[in-house]
Amino acid sequence: TFRAQKYGQFINITSVAGLVNLPLGNFYHSTKQAVESFSECMAYELVNFNISVSTVQFGNAPTSFQKNVTKCTKTEICSYNKLMDKISHLLEKKSGKNCELPQEIVEKLFSIAENPNKNFRRYTIGFDANLMRILRRFFGYKIFNFIIRKFTLK
């Protein structure tokens, strides 16, 4: 085990959705935040064993996630139809963007694996993920969330 050999590395894959929340994303965003919190706690617990922990956050990555977002039907609770239409439209618009990441992802993962950092690190891959992370840090929680609300709930 890592503790027995006194070194090792965990690279946990997550999403910028752990830091940036959108309407109707309760389950998705909360699981991504859970990976972030879990990883940070692991880093504290394992640092004395020379075991590093980092997370890699993607934004819009080359997956079928957006294609699998579905609208509710008449047999389901439809109170959110208007909002679901808006969010679905936003996801459809961005589904083709920023999806040329496989090479960048592979290079970043190899770089992290070859150069473990003793301190916990979050790595962000992709233009949209980096932009969201920077904007949230620059504007702070209150202003950033105001912008998200204006953009998604208008």
Feature-to-residue mapping (PLM):
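Active-site-adjacent segment of SDR/Rossmann-fold oxidoreductases
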Residues: 2, 20, 41-52
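Rossmann-fold scaffold of SDR-type NAD(P)-dependent oxidoreductases
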Residues: 12
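Residue(s) in the substrate-gating loop at a strand-loop-helix junction
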Residues: 15
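Active-site loop immediately N-terminal to the catalytic Tyr-X3-Lys motif
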Residues: 20-26
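Active-site helix of classical SDR
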Residues: 31-34
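C-terminal beta-strand-loop-alpha-helix "lid" module of Rossmann-like NAD(P)-dependent dehydrogenases
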Residues: 45-96
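Core catalytic loop region at the nicotinamide-binding pocket of NAD(P)H-dependent oxidoreductases
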Residues: 53, 93-137
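Non-catalytic terminal and boundary segments that flank Rossmann-like NAD(P)-dependent oxidoreductase
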Residues: 142-154
